[in-house]
């Protein structure tokens, strides 16, 4: 009993440190858009998308790689998932994940997600309409996570990730980790989760594309050109602290909410609900920006609203489990509304467990 009490005390102490770290680096309007690795902010997993990323307290299975790694501890069998989604501006988002238990309390999972931008016409200062050739950026995130059940109520997890971005002849790479905790109150039907995400190194682009051939300043006419290398700025990853709560209204319906405290953009609040009946589930949610900062002088109310409100609206999703002998095949679909500028984000996912 004393061991459990000491463990819980350590967990709460860790959570307090995470909260203080996040609040001390909380984002404002002035820092919005200055973080690198924005692909890390794209929600992944049908249930996570459908609930507007509000399900961190109750996330489970291999999908927890992208929401709260503590949920990896719920994996009891070999399982995996693959999904493909239409993101903004004809960008394809593909994901593969696989997980398995190592023993009775510890699990391991790995995943990779790739952004496919297609072929983009190559332009330059001399060929602003394109020179007839194309290039295709390569963005991916590779992850390896561990989950562990401390008790029947407490789960913890950690995920290490490699973030890679390549555009033509320049590239950038960063390393990051996610840390998560989930706590359940069975008698109260309450779930609480905390996840510190994308804590890692800074990203800086480099490569032959940063090189230029110029005449040195202050030299005499006829001086030969020299090669110069431009040093790109290095930027931090979009670190965030997600504090989430889930409450089961009954055996079929759960409501969820999550507050995302970002370091380099406006904080957000997400709410959602999931209803499941037998082997079918339905989910819906929405997210909103939580303003932090005063309206800029001279900015109209309309411009201020456009500047501070979320680009995303409601989200919905559904899925079904199909028993195949001793295995389970799951098929799910989710959609996230884009308020303007781009098409909605939709994703089709297939998962298995055996």
PLM segments and residue spans:
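Outer-membrane beta-barrel porins/channels
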Residues: 27-52, 93-354
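Cleavable N-terminal export/targeting peptides
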Residues: 1-38
């Amino acid at each position: 009993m004393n061991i459990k009490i000491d463990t819980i005390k350590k967990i709460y102490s860790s959570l307090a440190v995470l909260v203080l770290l996040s609040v001390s680096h909380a984002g404002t309007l002035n820092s919005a858009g200055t973080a690198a690795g924005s692909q890390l902010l794209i929600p992944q997993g049908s249930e996570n998308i459908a609930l507007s990323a509000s399900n961190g307290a109750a996330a489970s299975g291999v999908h927890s790689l992208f929401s709260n790694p503590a949920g990896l501890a719920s994996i009891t069998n070999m399982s995996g998932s693959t999904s493909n989604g239409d993101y903004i501006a004809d960008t394809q988002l593909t994901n593969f994940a696989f997980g398995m238990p190592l023993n009775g309390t510890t699990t391991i999972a790995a995943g990779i997600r790739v952004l496919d931008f297609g072929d983009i016409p190559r332009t330059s200062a001399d060929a602003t309409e394109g020179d007839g050739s194309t290039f295709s950026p390569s963005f991916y995130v590779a992850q390896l996570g561990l989950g562990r059940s401390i008790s029947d109520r407490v789960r913890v997890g950690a995920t290490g990730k490699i973030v890679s971005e390549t555009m033509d002849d320049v590239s950038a790479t960063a390393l990051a980790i996610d840390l998560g905790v989930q706590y359940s109150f069975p008698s109260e039907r309450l779930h609480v989760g905390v996840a510190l995400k994308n804590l890692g190194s800074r990203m800086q682009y480099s490569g032959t594309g940063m090189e230029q051939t110029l005449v040195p300043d202050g030299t005499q006419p006829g001086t030969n050109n020299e090669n110069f290398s431009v040093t790109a700025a290095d930027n931090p990853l979009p670190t965030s602290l997600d504090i989430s709560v889930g409450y089961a209204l009954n055996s079929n319906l759960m409501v969820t909410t999550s507050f995302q405290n970002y370091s380099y953009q406006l904080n957000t609040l997400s709410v959602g609900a999931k209803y499941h009946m037998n082997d079918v589930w339905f989910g819906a949610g929405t997210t909103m920006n939580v303003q932090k900062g005063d309206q800029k002088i001279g900015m109209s109310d309309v411009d201020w609203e456009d500047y501070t409100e979320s680009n995303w609206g409601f989200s919905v999703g559904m899925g079904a489990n199909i028993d195949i002998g001793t295995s389970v095949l799951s098929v799910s679909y989710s959609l996230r509304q884009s308020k303007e500028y781009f098409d909605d984000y939709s994703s089709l996912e297939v998962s298995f467990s055996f």
